[in-house]
Design a protein with these regions (language model features):
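N-terminal beta-alpha lobe that positions the nucleotide/phosphoryl donor
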Residues: 1-207
Length: 207
């Protein structure tokens, strides 16, 4: 903010009245004659409704098209699509029924340890590692609250937890002129609270 040419206060208090207020962000963009909006990280960065609102306002959303975000911004929707395409996926539950009873039955079927994940957003919010069934109910309550506060949605998915797995990413960047570049793999396995702390490239276990 200190390095920005212009800074606008979009609100104080809960994020629902500031960083999650789509209309307010677009209004500020128009007031400052901005041509594009970069969503940043977390909050609305993976919200397809925000990307669509930016597009409809005649501004450029720096990121994927709203249709792509709608597909990939929801872990439950994207995982269903991958399973339909027969892409190998971690065993889990990504159904519409979000009742405690259904999630409990699904958790027992998946087995422990397992991860509770917010279907929307990322950044480690709305995630809980559950090692035994007795801890599941409280973990679901906490994860739902975190997800709702951070992303505006309390929808959750469950996945089998692989404790000693590596987190490897490959990033692709494209522009509006059909140019595409990819970066070498990054090892993001060193984490704190399910959030990357260090990214190593190239990965020491792959190169």
């Amino acid at each position: 903010v200190a390095l920005a040419d212009e800074a606008i206060n979009i609100g104080l208090g809960p994020v629902n009245a500031s960083y999650l207020d789509i209309n307010k962000i677009i209004d500020v963009a128009k007031q400052t004659n901005a041509q594009s909006i970069h969503p940043g990280y977390g909050f609305l960065s993976e919200n397809s409704n925000f990307a669509k609102a930016v597009e409809l306002a005649g501004l450029t959303f720096i990121g994927p098209k709203s249709e792509a975000i709608a597909l990939m911004g929801s872990k439950s929707v994207s995982k269903k699509k991958m399973l339909e395409a027969k892409v190998p996926c971690i065993p889990g539950y990504q159904g519409d029924d979000q009742s405690d009873n259904t999630l409990l039955k699904s958790a027992k079927k998946i087995g422990f340890p397992l991860m509770i994940k917010a279907s929307a957003g990322g950044g480690g919010r709305g995630m809980r590692l559950v090692n035994q069934v007795d801890d599941l109910k409280d973990a679901l309550k906490i994860a739902r609250a975190e997800a709702l506060n951070a992303f505006g949605s309390s929808e959750l998915i469950l996945e089998k937890a692989f404790i000693n797995a590596r987190h490897i990413e490959i990033q692709i960047i494209s522009d509006a002129y059909g140019s595409h570049l990819y970066f070498g793999e990054r090892d993001c396995s060193i984490q704190r609270r399910h959030q990357k702390v260090i990214e190593e490239s190239p990965s020491p276990v792959m190169t």
